[in-house]
């Protein structure tokens, strides 16, 4: 139904290029909201199917992050944000899910950054685990919200989320992916000069069943 709605809206707009500005604005809003609902539905389906994903692939993180940077460069360039990578590591897990986890963290750091800021992904490999730090130069997250940001549909700044089309599911999915791999994610530090999110993951593929996210 959502795909049909999107197609019908696009067709109507294409067939009526001379519609009044008020109508065009209204239809544009409808398209934005339909797309947002479609993305929300897709993410919820992904979250419900996480347990079925195989997690036995060997993953080298630095090349993966470089690919993520390539995908997100157009978004970063809009605000003059530089993307930086430090370190590398190898782990066993789901390549697709780890990609999505780091992508979501990096995308979030870009969206809520300051103009001409920077985002750094730092990977540290230890004998038994990996530490992935994603740091930005944004305005920071108030301390009272630092536990809540991993809850589904939670948004610190609703006006900026509307601007970027966020539904408040990106970090909830990050939490679920980390937990599914036997790891964790948290706000390592945050101030008015920026935020660092830390994801800690075991390097081995012996993942236990993911603990339930009590915020869900």
Each language-model region and where it sits:
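Short alpha-helical segment of the dimerization/phosphotransfer core of two-component systems
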Residues: 29-37
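Short conserved segments within the C-terminal catalytic ATPase subdomain
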Residues: 75-85
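Short helix-loop "hinge" at the ATP-lid/N-box region of the Bergerat-fold HATPase_c
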Residues: 109-110
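Acidic ATP/Mg2+-coordinating residue in the GHKL
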Residues: 136
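Short conserved segment of the HATPase_c
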Residues: 141-155
């Amino acid at each position: 139904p959502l795909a049909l709605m999107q197609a019908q809206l696009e067709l109507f707009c294409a067939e009526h290029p001379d519609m009044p500005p008020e109508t065009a604005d209204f239809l544009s809003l409808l398209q934005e909201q339909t797309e947002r609902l479609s993305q929300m539905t897709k993410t919820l389906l992904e979250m419900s199917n996480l347990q079925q994903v195989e997690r036995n692939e060997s993953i080298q993180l630095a090349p993966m992050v470089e690919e993520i940077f390539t995908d997100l460069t157009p978004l970063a360039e809009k605000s003059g944000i530089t993307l930086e990578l430090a370190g590398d590591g190898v782990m066993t897990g789901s390549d697709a899910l780890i990609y999505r986890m780091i992508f979501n963290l990096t995308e979030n750091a870009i969206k809520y950054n300051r103009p001409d800021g920077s985002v750094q992904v730092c990977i540290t490999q230890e004998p038994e685990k990996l530490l992935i730090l994603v740091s930005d130069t944004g305005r920071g997250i108030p301390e009272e919200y630092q536990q809540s940001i991993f809850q589904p549909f939670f948004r610190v700044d609703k006006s900026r989320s509307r601007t970027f089309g966020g539904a408040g599911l990106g970090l909830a999915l990050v939490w679920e992916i980390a937990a599914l791999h036997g790891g964790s994610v948290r706000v390592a530090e945050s101030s008015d000069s920026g935020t660092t999110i830390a994801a800690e993951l075991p390097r081995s593929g012996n993942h236990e069943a993911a603990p339930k996210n009590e915020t869900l």
